[in-house]
Every structure is written in structure tokens, then in C-alpha cells.
Amino acid sequence: MELMPNRSLNGLYMFLDCIFLVLLAFYFVKTKRYVPLLVGVLGGLLYFLADYGGFYLLLGTRKVVGANPFWFLLWLSMSYGFTNMVWMWLWFAEPENRLEFSLLIIVWWFSVAVISNGAGAAFPVISIERGTGGYHWIMAVFLFIGYAILIFKNLQTKQPTERMPLLSILAIGLLVQFAWEAVLLITGIRSAGIRTLIVDSLMETNLGAPYLYLIYAALSKPKEVA
């Protein structure tokens, strides 16, 4: 199943997004949210390993035009890897603040896209694309295994407090990818259509949600997640 997700954005987008990421990291330090900060940084590095090391160097499916691939993909990975992982972790750890953190990230993604489209004409344009046929099936394997682990845990447990919050995990797994895919499509940064939005939303970030929840549950006493 070959899809070609693509983006075309300018340097102003990158500049503004770097400021946002620094401010968000500073907020986490100020409020002593050190674990989400660490999870975000590790998530960004994991994304970079997959994108630059896997898609660009190993598979050759990632194309970058208008920027140095290493530095551009480092920013791209830290941007989405950091926000995606932070958002999911806080969804599990702070259910009372789900709306606030969700709005913060979604509104930022939309705002920076519109601002850079309107005010970034003087900045260089970077275009990227990525073929998915060579690895989406691998993602599907991890997607199934992750959710199968949670499902069988629920089928085997007799204690309500030990059940995995499947609906909540699925909700954030779908929401994260769908939110930024939709923003990219609506604002014209991504020209790929609805099929790419749906498949990527079902597949990509969602495959990591079960594993991240298992890590969260192992490291902390989970709050009741609805």
C-alpha cells in the first residue's frame, strides 16, 4: 500500500516552531514536569533515528529538497517526536489537563502553519516526501502486537482496576496523528489527500500508543483513565 506523504513549508515555520519547543520545554522545567520533558526528548531522538537513519539513509524513501537533510530531519523529528510523545504521556498522566494540553498543541500547529504561509514569503521553501510501501506493513505488525497485548491483558484480568484503558489509549493514538495531518492538509502544507490522512492516522503514531502506555504504567501508579 504505497502512499507518498509530502510537505512544503518555509523557514519561518521552522524558526517559529523552534521558539515554541524551547518555551514548552522551559514550561516543563518551571513546573517540574521532568518526566514528560525527558519522554519528549527521547521521542524526538527515536523519530530522528527512524526518519533519518531508517527512511533517509537505509531505505532511501525520504526526500528533502531545499535544506540539509540531516538538520532539517533533526528539527522535524524533534518537533513532532517531542510534541507527540509529550502529548500522549500527559494524556495518561494528567487526565484532568487533557483539554488544555490538547488545545495548546493543536492550536499551535494550526497557527504556525497559517502564520508562516502568510508572512514567510521571504524565507526559503523546503519540500519533503516519503514513500511508505516499504515499511507500512512493518508498522502494521507493531500496531497489532501492541493492541493485542492490551486486549489479552484485559481478557485475562479479573480486577477492574487492572484493566487497560483501551478507549483512552486508542483515542489519543488516533487524535495525535489525525490532528497534525488534518492541519497540514487544511493549510496546504501537505497536498496528499484524505486517504493519506486516514491511513497515517490509523497507523503511525497510533502504533506507539499501547507501548507508551505500558511504559507509563510500569513507571508510575496510573490514575484511573476513562
Segments from the language model and where they lie:
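Aromatic-rich, lipid-facing transmembrane alpha helices and their immediate juxtamembrane interface loops
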Residues: 1-226
